[in-house]
Every structure is written in structure tokens, then in C-alpha cells.
């Protein structure tokens, strides 16, 4: 009788597992399909401009007319990539705001709005260009695009430590933490020319800036030396976390892809981060800039403040974002102003 009961319980357990595993597999397949859909819907800045007929440029920045743009070219491939040579003519209706060269390179001169037209062999195409001093830089837009592209491409698949990002950075097998390496890979892919902290020129007028440092602390040191380690997030900035339990200031680094100002110093921040549970993850959380830690040093770390919180549950609307915090003992240390 006892043996029969044990066999019955075992069969019931096996039946439950058979029901559970197909359901889990189906859920994972649905998630992968959603990742693939998001990837197919993702648009580079130029592609978005072609579709919408609108483009934004930060004052002083340049970008090719969307329809002739070569796309987002990694820095280490730019030398071998020819400049566009489109047929036809370009013109701006307000050169005090935007000028355009004969090959379609638009340059933002001053805040305002201008319409740039391309008279091509196939007919006229027009783009309304908005210029502003506070807009995200062109390379910042590219960086956000690349980060999202990598996130949707990896689709939360588990990666080895010696993955495509580590291979690109180290050029030889090296199994180490790769959160900083992931940011450098994406920065290069976006067109940044990452530099070593040791090569930093404190007198140089850097505009767009990224550090080729596989150690999180070295990235922080570089931004901090230039006064570009800040307490307010912007898309395209890096974000460095502090371990409150150990008071370790540079425990991990990710990158900001979206920011929503909620008022009173509170921001909803969305990030893409490598080397989280051996994959690439996206997080969305609330950050309180009134409790910024960016000016804390090793001598003053006893004053570190907790400044992260979960969004209200009713705002957990994107199945591809993680709304649960990384841990219960991390806080934002600060943000690296890459542009």
C-alpha cells in the first residue's frame, strides 16, 4: 500500500512537471518573439527622421540628411567608410539655423527651426530640423540606439564571460566582469573614440567623451577629473552604482537610455546594463536626485544615501523591462556626462 501511494505521488509530480516545463518553454518563446519584434521596430536616428520627416540637432552638431545618411558607423570602421555622394542638390530655408553641404551634411548653427530639402533625381524630399542648446547630442542618440539594439539582440540569453564584447575589447581570452567593457563596445559602435584615462588632457575642450577603461573605477576617475560626474541623469550618460553594504563606490556601471522628469528632483530612469546575471538587462526605476551621491569620496562615504525606488506596480507595463531593483543594497553613485 505504501509503495502504491509513493508511486501515485511520483506520477502526480511527473505530470505536474510535464505541464510546467512546456508552459515555461512557451513563455520563453513568446518573450524571444517579442524581443525580435522590438528589434525589427527599432530605428536609428536617421531612419526615424526618414519616416517622420523631422529631425533634431543639438547646437553645433552635424548629421547627414536622413535619406543619404550612411547610418551609425562604429568609430573603428569610420576611416574605411566613404562619405555619402548623393546626386541632386540640398538647400536650407534658414541658414541662420541650419546649413547643409553639397553632400547633405547638416550643421546646427543656432536654436530654431529650418526645413532642409533634397532635390534628388527621384523628386524632392524635405525634413524639418529643430535645433536646440539642450537637445541630446548626435552621438548620444547613436549610443542610445546601439544600447537598445544590443539589448534586443541578446534577448536576455545567458552569455559566457568571454563573450562578443570581451572578445572585441581584450582581443584574447579573458574571463572577467564585463559591465564596463559592454559600455565601451557600445560607445565605439555609436561613433565615440574612447580614450584611456591616462591620456586625458584636462585642458582640452571635450564635447563628446567616453573612456576606454574596463575598470568601473577608472571610468569614474576620468569623468570626475573633468567635473563631468554628475547627479542628474540624461539619455546617453553612463550610470555608476555604489554598494551601500560595503560602501564600495564603483561596484557596477550601466548606461541611461531614457529619462522622465517626475518633478521635485525625482526621475524615472531606464538603463541598459551588461554583466547582470550573465546577460544584458534593462531596468526602469525611480531615482531621487535630492539624495545624489556624486560628490561623495572615499573619505566621506559614510554620508552615502539610498536614492533608488521601484516604480508603482501599475506602471510595470513593459514586459521587457525589469522593475525590481538590482539588489536591496545598491544606490546610484552618479552619472558620467558623455556629451
What are these regions (language model features)?
Residues 132, 257-258, 287, 334-339:
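Short beta-strand-to-coil "C-cap" segments at the C-terminal boundary of structured domains/repeats
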Residues 132-195, 336-338:
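N-terminal capping segments
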Residues 193-281:
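...with weaker cross-activation on analogous glycine-rich loops/strands in unrelated enzymes
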Residues 26-135, 269:
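Extracytoplasmic soluble-region selector
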Residues 290-339:
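Low-complexity, Gly/Ser/Thr/Pro-rich intrinsically disordered linker/tail segments
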Residues 274-299:
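Glycine- and charge-enriched low-complexity intrinsically disordered segments
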Residues 1-39:
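Gram-positive cell-envelope targeting signals
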Amino acid at each position: 500500500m505504501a509503495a502504491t501511494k509513493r508511486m501515485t505521488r511520483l506520477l502526480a509530480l511527473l505530470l505536474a512537471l510535464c505541464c510546467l516545463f512546456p508552459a515555461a518553454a512557451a513563455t520563453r518563446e513568446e518573450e524571444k518573439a517579442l524581443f525580435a519584434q522590438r528589434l525589427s521596430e527599432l530605428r536609428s536616428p536617421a531612419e526615424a527622421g526618414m519616416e517622420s520627416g523631422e529631425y533634431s540637432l543639438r547646437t553645433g552638431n552635424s548629421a547627414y540628411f536622413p535619406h543619404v545618411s550612411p547610418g551609425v558607423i562604429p568609430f573603428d570602421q569610420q576611416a574605411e567608410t566613404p562619405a555619402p555622394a548623393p546626386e541632386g542638390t540640398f538647400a536650407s530655408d534658414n541658414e541662420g539655423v541650419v546649413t547643409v553641404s553639397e553632400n547633405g551634411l547638416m550643421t546646427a548653427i543656432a536654436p530654431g527651426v529650418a526645413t532642409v530639402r533634397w532635390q534628388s533625381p527621384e523628386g524632392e524630399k524635405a525634413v524639418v530640423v529643430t535645433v536646440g542648446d539642450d537637445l541630446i547630442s548626435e552621438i548620444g542618440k547613436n549610443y542610445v540606439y546601439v544600447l537598445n539594439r544590443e539589448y534586443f539582440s541578446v534577448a536576455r540569453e545567458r552569455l559566457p564571460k568571454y563573450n562578443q564584447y570581451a572578445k572585441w575589447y581584450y582581443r584574447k581570452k579573458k574571463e572577467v566582469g564585463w559591465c564596463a567593457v559592454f559600455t565601451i563596445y557600445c560607445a565605439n559602435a555609436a561613433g565615440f573614440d574612447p580614450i584611456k584615462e591616462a591620456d586625458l588632457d584636462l585642458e582640452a575642450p571635450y564635447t563628446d567623451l567616453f573612456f576606454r577603461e574596463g575598470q568601473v573605477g577608472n571610468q569614474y576617475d576620468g569623468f570626475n577629473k573633468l567635473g563631468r560626474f554628475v547627479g542628474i541623469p540624461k539619455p546617453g550618460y553612463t550610470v555608476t552604482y555604489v554598494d551601500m553594504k560595503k560602501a564600495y563606490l564603483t561596484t557596477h556601471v550601466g548606461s541611461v537610455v531614457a529619462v522622465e522628469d517626475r518633478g521635485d528632483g525625482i526621475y524615472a530612469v531606464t538603463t541598459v546594463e551588461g554583466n547582470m546575471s550573465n546577460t544584458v538587462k534593462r531596468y526602469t526605476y525611480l531615482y531621487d536626485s535630492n539624495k545624489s551621491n556624486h560628490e561623495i569620496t572615499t573619505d566621506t562615504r559614510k554620508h552615502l544615501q539610498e536614492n533608488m525606488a521601484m516604480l508603482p506596480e501599475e506602471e510595470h507595463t513593459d514586459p521587457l523591462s525589469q522593475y525590481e531593483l538590482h539588489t536591496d543594497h545598491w544606490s546610484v553613485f552618479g552619472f558620467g556626462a558623455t556629451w
